[in-house]
UniProtKB/Swiss-Prot annotation:
Protein name: Disintegrin EC3A
Gene3D superfamilies, per the entry: Disintegrin domain
Main subcellular location: secreted
Disulfide bonds: C6-C29, C20-C26, C25-C50, C38-C57
Domain Disintegrin: residue ranges: 1-65
Other facts noted in the record for this chain: Negative results: does not inhibit alpha-V/beta-3 (ITGAV/ITGB3) integrin.
Localization: Secreted
Motif, Cell attachment site: chain positions: 42-44
Cellular component terms per the entry's GO annotation: extracellular region
Length: 67
């Protein structure tokens, strides 16, 4: 049974000093820089970007026909 390198095995939370365990805006236990593309545009939509403060990929406000 292997433990995720970013996870405190007792609490199953990010280890002290680290930001995240997984997600499209998490790499090597840290949030990706704000403005990093986390989802490329499809159709007439626009790219989604990491916020720099969460491991999730926030949806942009513009919704194309594909959304």
């Amino acid at each position: 049974n292997s433990v995720h390198p970013c996870c405190d095995p007792v609490k199953c939370e990010p280890r002290e000093g680290e930001h995240c365990i997984s997600g499209p805006c998490c790499r090597n236990c840290y949030f990706l820089r704000a403005g990093t593309v986390c989802k490329r545009a499809v159709g007439d939509d626009v790219d989604d970007y990491c916020s720099g403060i969460t491991p999730d990929c926030p949806r942009n406000r513009y919704k194309g026909k594909e959304d």
